[in-house]
């Protein structure tokens, strides 16, 4: 007997904002979404700040969004957790940090600090780096090197020079720390097995290979002069003495796992085969658990378990579920949706559609959405699933490029695909929910007219198709309880979200 599916469609990076000449969402032709908003119950959801477990005013992101959606509760995030530890002093007692620094003192080796150098708060925060430098000073370390991964996505594309200067000033103030390398996140924080990029980052940090410039601020300025912004700055070696060597200690201060895995594995995994290199031992600290299978690492802030999230609960009830996305968002509908657990639950199937191999997604704003859509429709029509969780990556990934015309095309692509998935769901007698995890494509320009590549704090939509009812405004944590509500299932007690359906 065919199942009647409840399908959750997550339009990654699709926020709500007034029409403007930089709003790709309103500039796009969206006949499907226009029709859905007109015909079905809809509301708005908060996807940022305190409502998703982030500091007040902090923009949401895909990891946080999917964790809250899948958890059915506000999940306290790593950024405020670590920041609070700095405030209360427990940060400086952290076992993994202390082990890394004590090993340097015992062996006479160097401490390397690396991560995304910005205050964007998505992958890291510069204040956490400053706290590590303070800790290194307090412990009397002298050989401390910083490898700066420039951002340009979660903050302005040319803010990196200012962050590098700020770091230099902090090092001078503390009397500890030297910048060893500078490079764009494009190289050091790949997540799509583009090993040629990762190797450039590795070679700069380990072998001292790449461009050379003894002044890190000037190095970034020179890149700007060549028309290359923060994200894409090619690796520059600043201090040739700052290469990573045998028995050195490394603290990777990024707390978001997905873009931290590849460069970490290249250093710590003896069986790594992404490119040719020789393995050597280090004391390596991952700020959070990047991957449960990662060998030879310490974890500074182990993940707090999200028990009885939607995936686990559906499985315990004997329900079947499908998770489907292209590469760029596959971890989000699986690992993050399951609360940071790699485990695949009984009854949970997964479909990964490869993302296109292009340098930047403005070159192919459709990405792999049509393939994701077709595979999803096929699975819906199979009648095999009670719940389907689907992500369309386009509005976010193309929004990050800052190219407005491409973002418009991305929105239009998603609109077409949403229509097909909703139609297939309704034809099976099911219910479709259309929402987003955070904003991005609705705000493509900075006030000065330069490209806006970061996420936003705007509200996101929630449309309930196939069930005529009244909805209240809410937050991402309310989606899972709403799914359970339309399925006639009680919420587990661990979920503190509430159904969006007005009773």
What are the roles of these predicted feature ranges?
Residues 1-503:
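Feature captures the catalytic ectodomains and active-site-proximal regions of enzymes
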């Amino acid at each position: 007997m065919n199942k009647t599916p409840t399908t959750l469609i997550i339009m990654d990076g699709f926020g709500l904002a007034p029409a403007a000449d930089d709003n790709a969402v309103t500039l796009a032709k969206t006949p499907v979404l226009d029709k859905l908003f007109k015909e079905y119950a809809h509301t708005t959801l908060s996807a940022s700040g305190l409502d998703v477990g982030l500091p007040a005013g902090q923009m949401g992101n895909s990891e946080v969004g999917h964790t809250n959606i899948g958890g059915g509760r506000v999940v306290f995030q790593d950024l405020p957790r670590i920041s609070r530890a700095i405030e209360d002093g427990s940060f400086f007692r952290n076992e993994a940090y202390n082990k890394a620094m004590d090993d340097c003192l015992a062996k006479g080796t160097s401490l390397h600090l690396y991560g995304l150098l910005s205050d964007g708060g998505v992958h890291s925060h510069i204040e956490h780096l400053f706290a590590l430098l303070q800790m290194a000073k307090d412990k009397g370390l002298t050989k401390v090197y910083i490898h700066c991964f420039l951002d340009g996505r979660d903050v302005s594309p040319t803010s990196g020079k200012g962050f590098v200067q700020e770091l230099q000033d902090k090092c001078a103030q503390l009397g500890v720390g030297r910048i060893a390398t500078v490079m764009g996140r494009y190289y050091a924080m790949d997540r799509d097995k583009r090993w040629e990029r990762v190797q450039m980052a590795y070679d700069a940090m380990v072998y001292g290979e790449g461009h050379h410039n003894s002044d890190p601020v000037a190095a970034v300025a020179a890149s700007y002069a060549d028309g290359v912004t923060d994200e894409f700055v090619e690796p520059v070696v600043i201090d040739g003495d700052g290469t990573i060597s045998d028995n050195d200690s490394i603290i990777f201060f990024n707390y978001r796992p997905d873009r931290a895995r590849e460069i970490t594995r290249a250093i710590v995994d003896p069986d790594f085969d992404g490119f040719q290199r020789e393995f050597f031992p280090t004391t390596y600290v991952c700020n959070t658990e990047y991957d449960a299978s990662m060998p030879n690492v310490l974890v500074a802030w182990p993940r707090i378990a999200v028990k009885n999230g939607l995936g686990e609960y559906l499985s315990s009830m004997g329900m079947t579920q499908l998770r489907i996305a292209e590469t760029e968002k596959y971890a989000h509908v699986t690992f993050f949706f399951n609360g940071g657990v790699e485990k695949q639950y009984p009854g949970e199937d997964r479909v990964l559609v490869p993302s296109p191999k292009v340098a930047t997604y403005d070159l192919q704003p459709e990405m792999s959405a049509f393939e994701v859509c077709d595979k999803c429709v096929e699975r819906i029509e199979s009648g095999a699933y009670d719940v389907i969780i689907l992500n369309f990556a386009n509005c976010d990934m193309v929004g990050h490029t800052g190219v407005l015309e491409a973002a418009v095309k991305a929105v239009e692509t998603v609109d077409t695909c949403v229509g097909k998935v909703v139609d297939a769901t309704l034809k099976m007698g099911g219910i479709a929910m259309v929402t987003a995890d955070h904003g991005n494509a609705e705000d493509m320009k900075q006030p000065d007219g330069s490209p806006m590549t970061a996420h936003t704090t705007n509200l996101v939509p929630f449309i309930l198709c196939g069930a005529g009812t009244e909805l209240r405004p809410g937050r991402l944590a309310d989606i899972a309880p709403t799914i359970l509500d339309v399925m006639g299932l009680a919420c587990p007690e661990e979920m503190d979200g509430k159904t969006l359906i007005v009773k």
